[in-house]
């Protein structure tokens, strides 16, 4: 098959629905790890910074390279869209092939249990309808990823459409809600842990030609973004609503990627998201650490509403009644978030922000948790280990400036 990985084509992804994606913006300072459930326990971190942990280079391809820092994979890609995709594919080929096989196998098994469900067909339909709105750059990067990984282009396209089925929640705190005024933007990604995505976690540092450099907390074989920040200190998060099937627009993960690559300010981010045709129903949190400030967005293909801090929305729970807060969540998790915000209002720092994201705000299926402090040039990432939620695992601290300025070891 022209050297491409042969994977059984079958119904899949019926369980590939994101349970909850929690995006957090907190203005304050430092760190993280979790042990037992609950916000009152101390937090821990380990360093992934070059001054204390020497990165181990695992491979070099063109302008890109793969390294391991504090036990975690960090992929650097640079250049044209095709070059970045090809570097990604070559350097992570075994992992990409393994993940695609795993996803298709899981889908096949689920299809046998529920013959009426055809998630593969739905995802392929989504791609076809989104295709007119997917940039040539993204299409070229997907082609490079396919060539580099030896996975068929159709399979690469299909797996990259998975975020269109995601569902999420989020919030932002800043100004009077925090201590010191430093912007922290965090994310909790709750997902079907049994699919093993957390075993393929990869921090991606991208330097696309003529665009912003950005950091993407992602997974092998994916070029879109659900959690990320750029070198202009603009950070993006999202939560999903309804509207599944409204796919005549740019896929959410590619829109997030567009924001990372192009936005130099909060205003830029709002303009990009407002001007770009969108899919389904999504709520976004965009923050700019330079100001600092944040906005919530309530969007559908035919709607674009900008929510200022503290503003309510009919499809979201009532605000907590505090200033400088954008809360986007639901059900009991929202009530717990609100209680934790009120408890530490005006005192939020890094540890408090990380405690805010602990179980049961994070679900048992939490596969990654992240906290960004762009103005400080630091961020912290935790990935699930086995069946232990990421929110209860050790965080790794990274130096964003060091990563953005890193030079190829070649």
Where do the protein language model's features map onto the residues?
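C-terminal, well-structured catalytic/ligand-binding subdomain of enzymes
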Residues: 36-146, 177-184, 188-410
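General helical structural elements
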Residues: 13-15, 19, 161, 191, ...
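Bacterial N-terminal signal peptides
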Residues: 15-29
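Boundary at the C-terminal end of the N-terminal hydrophobic targeting segment
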Residues: 32-34
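Gly/Pro-rich turn-and-neighbor structural signature
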Residues: 145-187
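N-terminal secretory signal peptides that target proteins for export/translocation
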Residues: 1-13
